[in-house]
Amino acid sequence: MLIPRKVKHRKQHHPRQRGIASGGTSVNFGDYGIQALEHAYVTNRQIESARIAINRHIKRGGKVWINIFPDRPLTKKPAETRMGSGKGSPEWWVANVKPGRVLFELSYPNEAIARAALTRAIHKLPIKARIITREEQF
């Protein structure tokens, strides 16, 4: 699982999700990429599930890059707890994804298999996304 080794503060505020991604919007390492089309918090489990889906489909001969990292903790209070008495304990680690951000990159010689693998990964993610290539970037 992807989690930070050490953080300065255990709990953070939840900012509003607005704006578009300013960096990380192009395919730099691989030939194909998954680009987000909307705002979302992507958890470390969803990132890992998408990575496994890609690797199982391409088997061997390709390389996968993960361009996001879950560095923000989300907290949750236990079930059937009264209001008040502070903020809940950290439950998940999430990556704050903005529209335009490239989440995964893939290098693979066969385009049809690469697109099928990335489509499987998109189904594991909680956002609308599209597949882009190194040539067709906006």
Swiss-Prot record:
Question: Family, per the entry?
Answer: Belongs to the universal ribosomal protein uL16 family.
Renumbered to this chain, the Basic residues biased-composition regions fall at 1-17
Q: What residue spans carry the region label Disordered?
A: 1-24
Protein's name according to its UniProt entry: Large ribosomal subunit protein uL16
- Pfam families in alphabetical order: Ribosomal_L16
Alphabetical GO CC annotations of the entry are:
cytosolic large ribosomal subunit
Domain of life, per lineage? Bacteria
Q: Name any one GO molecular function.
A: structural constituent of ribosome
Quaternary data: Part of the 50S ribosomal subunit.
What is this organism's lineage? Bacteria, Bacillati, Actinomycetota, Actinomycetes, Mycobacteriales
